[in-house]
């Protein structure tokens, strides 16, 4: 109890500490990574009725099929969203909610079309091999090209599709650092 009181006493004063928005996310107990325009529109209507302020389209929005190991390019699936992802984002906004999407910007799936087209220095490396966990490579943000890729993804989502909220997730455990251009894996974290 005392530690909680102390933490609350030193916390900065700001509106975001007082009023957290109500966010609907379509993943848990709902679409489980299988979003489509047809499935999303009725959920958006119900989320609005329930008083939600944000609506997040979770994983799968970028893949025609199994989405887990195809992450990384972050281009909307035309099969899932025949009218485009922007159509769904615009519908969310028309209901007075902030549209959002799920991302794991720090990874690229082993089946992502871009994964084999970029040089190895985009990834954490150990013992001369790309580090991966659960079918995903860990991106190395020391590389300016990786930063440019991430910036381009965010810019596109915001400017082309009207995304106003990003749920940033992290679902792998790649271990400590990279040995590429470093004396040790830990040194590779220092940039």
Q: What residues fall within each predicted segment?
A:
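Beta-strand-rich recognition/accessory modules
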Residues: 1-15
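Short, flexible, glycine/charge-rich loop motifs used to bind or transfer phosphoryl groups or to couple energy/partner
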Residues: 12-13, 45, 156
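Solvent-exposed loop and edge beta-strand segments that line ligand/cofactor-binding
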Residues: 13, 30-31, 77, 186-190
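A short, mixed-charge helix-start or loop-turn motif at secondary-structure junctions
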Residues: 25-26, 70-71, 135-139
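Active-site neighborhood of glycoside hydrolase catalytic domains
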Residues: 80-84, 88-94, 116-191
């Amino acid at each position: 109890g005392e530690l909680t009181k102390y933490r609350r006493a030193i916390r900065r004063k700001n509106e975001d500490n007082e009023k957290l928005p109500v966010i609907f996310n379509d993943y848990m107990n709902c679409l489980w990574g299988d979003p489509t325009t047809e499935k999303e529109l009725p959920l958006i209507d119900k989320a609005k009725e329930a008083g939600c302020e944000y609506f997040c389209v979770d994983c799968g929005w970028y893949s025609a099929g199994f989405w887990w190991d195809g992450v990384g390019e972050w281009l909307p699936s035309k099969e899932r969203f025949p009218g485009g992802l922007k159509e769904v984002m615009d519908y969310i906004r028309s209901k007075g909610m902030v549209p959002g999407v799920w991302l794991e910007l720090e990874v690229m799936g082993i089946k992502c079309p871009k994964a084999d087209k970029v040089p190895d220095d985009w990834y954490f490396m150990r013992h001369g091999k790309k580090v991966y966990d659960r079918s995903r490579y860990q991106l190395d943000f020391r590389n300016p090209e990786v930063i440019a890729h991430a910036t381009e993804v965010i810019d596109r989502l915001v400017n082309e599709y009207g995304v106003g909220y990003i749920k940033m997730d992290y679902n792998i455990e790649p271990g400590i650092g990279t040995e590429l251009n470093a004396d040790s894996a830990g040194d590779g974290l220092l940039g």
